[in-house]
Each structure stands twice: as C-alpha cells, then as structure tokens.
Swiss-Prot record:
<feature type="binding site">
    <location>
        <position position="118"/>
    </location>
    <ligand>
        <name>Mg(2+) 1</name>
    </ligand>
</feature>
<dbReference type="GO" id="GO:0042132">
    <property type="term" value="F:fructose 1,6-bisphosphate 1-phosphatase activity"/>
</dbReference>
<comment type="subunit">
    <text>Homotetramer.</text>
</comment>
<comment type="pathway">
    <text>Carbohydrate biosynthesis; gluconeogenesis.</text>
</comment>
<feature type="binding site">
    <location>
        <position position="119"/>
    </location>
    <ligand>
        <name>Mg(2+) 2</name>
    </ligand>
</feature>
<feature type="binding site">
    <location>
        <position position="276"/>
    </location>
    <ligand>
        <name>substrate</name>
    </ligand>
</feature>
<dbReference type="InterPro" id="IPR028343">
    <property type="entry name" value="FBPtase"/>
</dbReference>
<dbReference type="GO" id="GO:0005986">
    <property type="term" value="P:sucrose biosynthetic process"/>
</dbReference>
<feature type="binding site">
    <location>
        <begin position="119"/>
        <end position="122"/>
    </location>
    <ligand>
        <name>substrate</name>
    </ligand>
</feature>
<dbReference type="InterPro" id="IPR033391">
    <property type="entry name" value="FBPase_N"/>
</dbReference>
<dbReference type="GO" id="GO:0030388">
    <property type="term" value="P:fructose 1,6-bisphosphate metabolic process"/>
</dbReference>
<keyword id="KW-0460">Magnesium</keyword>
<dbReference type="GO" id="GO:0000287">
    <property type="term" value="F:magnesium ion binding"/>
</dbReference>
<dbReference type="InterPro" id="IPR000146">
    <property type="entry name" value="FBPase_class-1"/>
</dbReference>
<dbReference type="GO" id="GO:0006094">
    <property type="term" value="P:gluconeogenesis"/>
</dbReference>
<comment type="similarity">
    <text>Belongs to the FBPase class 1 family.</text>
</comment>
<feature type="binding site">
    <location>
        <position position="210"/>
    </location>
    <ligand>
        <name>substrate</name>
    </ligand>
</feature>
Length: 337
C-alpha cells in the first residue's frame, strides 16, 4: 500500500462522520486523543527494562491487585491526554477507586471515558502481548458527572476499542457501525487502516480458558469444556484446541481474527463474587466489539451488554466470541437452573 493511498485513523473517522452522520465531532476528537495516548503507552511498553518501568510499584489498586509500574504510568497517560480537551465530563479507570471529574479549570464535554489502562499486566515482565481497553458513554446529566452517571448498561456505549501492544501495535475500534483495525506505522506515527469490517466466524474449534481452575468450575462450564476435550470421540465429534494467553486483549484479538470462544467464568472459590472481569472496563467494551463483529457475549445467563451496573468495579462472568459456541455454553447454564 502506497503512503499516498493509506487510510489513517483520522481520515477514516472524518469519512465516517461525513457518510453516516452519526459520529459527532466531539466523539471523533475524543477517539483520536485516546488513540494518541495508546501510542504513548505503546512507546513506554516497548522500552521495557530500558525505560525503568518494569516491575511492581509497591502499591495495590482498588481490587487489591499489586500494581505494576506500567499500570500506573499508563493510567496517568490516559488521564493527562484526555482531561483538557473539552470532550469529557469525567473518566473512570480500573486502577482508581473513584471516578475522575474533569478539573474545573478545563472545559467539560458530554462524554464519559471508561478504561482499563493496561490489561494483562501480569505479562509485562515476560514480554507477552498486553493492551488498553476503553469505552465511551454519554453523560446523562449533561456535563456534571457523578458515579451514577457511569452506571449505564453496555447498550448505551457510543464507542469502544482496544489497543494491543505486541509484535505490531494495533488499535481496534467500533462506533456501532462495524469493527475496524488500525496498525501503528512507527516510522510516521500514524494509525493505518489494515482490516475493515472484521467478522468472527460463527463456528470455531478453538477455546480460551484458564484450565488450571477446572476443579473450581460450576457444572455447565465443566460439561462444556469436557465435551470440547473429548474431541472426535466425544459428543461434539471434532477436535478442539485450547489457547490461553492470560491477556484478554490478546485472546480477544485472536478470536476476532480467526474465531474462538473466550471464557472467564465465576467459580466456587468465591461464590459471593460473580466472576473476575470488570463489567465497565473489560466486559462491556469487548462485548460491544464482539457483537459488532457478528459474535455473542453473555454472562452465561444474560447478554453482557444488558447487565445493569451497580458499581464502577462490578465483576461479571464472561463468555464471548463465536456465536454458536457462546449460545451453546449459555444454553448449558439455562439447563442447569
């Protein structure tokens, strides 16, 4: 592809604004700012030990997880990049206990930005793909946000995306009109459109789950995975392969490209906690992307994007990816009720 014929993220968004007339200018600018912040995060991730950003920071986030230095740095990059542009009323991050209102000395906008600044950060020190996940909502209270302003079901998202910092840095985006992937051209610093209208195959022979937790799973998940593992001699009559990167962005990106099902179920170790992944920061944005690509996403009992949030850091079980497989494991949950 010649440089002159490349479609950059900026050009793509402007063309979308002209063609569909459903991409407001402030939302377009917000997406571009988030994408620029992801470039900065990518740069810091790629420096590794040379940037003195590996290892833990000696602190814990609101979930009680030990924070990596790059967790904190990535969070600061996103806050600093977005607080002054006039597009946002407030932000919320997986790394912060409460939401972040736009300071009074900056103009405020009508949108809310929700993000996981560095998903899969347990993989930082071993150089495995990690990423950033984000979601955009409208502020129902105009420009004066409260915590309640964020507690909207995923169906209210106006944009969602993620960046993967791997062999290439990619930025995957939906604004409710399909899913597109942009690759970072490091030489010129531009996001270049490399995949349009991405679609997840309805059927798959790959699944992603942390099998070390098998002894803790509830019966519907055990049944489903046992059938997959039985291969050609089992009830499915086919062989399936397991893939598990322990980085949601990397696992979902693989599924978006070649199909599969990603599962992070609730289990018996914490019966009072429904799952591990965060609804607002991980499950909702990824579900929006997956559904826009023709896939499905449920908690096992409910469409994820229809869950009514009750708190910023609410957790849910997650089953997402190829539609027929998600519907099958969801059906097993229905049968077990």
């Amino acid at each position: 592809m010649s440089i002159a014929r490349r479609t950059t993220l900026s050009k793509f968004l402007i063309e979308q604004q002209r063609e569909t007339n459903n991409l407001p200018a402030d939302l377009r600018l917000l997406i571009e700012v988030v994408a620029r912040a992801c470039k900065a995060i990518s740069y810091n991730v790629s420096k590794g030990a040379l940037g003195d950003a590996l290892g833990t920071a000696g602190s814990e986030n609101v979930q009680g997880e030990v924070q990596k230095k790059l967790d904190i740095l990535s969070n600061e990059i996103l806050l600093d990049a977005n607080e002054w542009g006039g597009n946002l009323a407030a932000m919320a991050s997986e790394e912060m206990e409460t939401f972040f209102p736009i300071p009074a000395n900056y103009p405020r906008g009508e949108y809310l930005l929700v993000f996981d600044p560095l998903d899969g950060s347990s993989n930082i020190d071993v150089n495995v793909s990690i990423g950033t996940i984000f979601s955009v909502l409208r502020c129902p209270d105009g420009k004066q946000a409260t915590e309640e302003s964020f507690l909207q079901p995923g169906t209210e998202q106006v944009a969602a995306g993620y960046a993967v910092y791997g062999p290439q840095t990619v930025f995957v985006l939906t604004t409710g009109n399909g899913v597109n992937c942009f690759t970072l051209d490091r030489e010129v610093g531009s996001w270049v459109l490399t995949q349009s209208n991405m679609q997840i195959p309805a059927d798959t022979r790959e699944y992603a789950i942390n099998a070390s937790n098998a002894r803790h799973w509830y019966d519907p998940v055990k049944r489903y995975v046992d059938e997959l593992n039985a291969g050609k001699d089992g009830p499915r009559g086919d062989n399936f392969n397991m893939r598990w990167i322990a980085s949601m962005v990397a696992d979902v990106h693989r599924i978006l490209n070649r199909g599969g099902i990603f599962m992070y179920p609730a289990d018996k170790r914490t019966p009072d906690r429904p799952g591990k992944l965060r609804l607002m920061y991980e499950a909702n944005p990824m579900s929006f992307i997956v559904e826009q690509a023709g896939g499905a996403a449920t908690t096992g009992t409910q469409r994820i994007m229809e869950v009514q949030p009750t708190g910023l850091h609410q957790r849910v079980p997650v089953f997402l990816g190829s539609k027929n497989e998600v519907e099958r494991v969801t059906g097993y949950h229905d049968e077990a009720k």
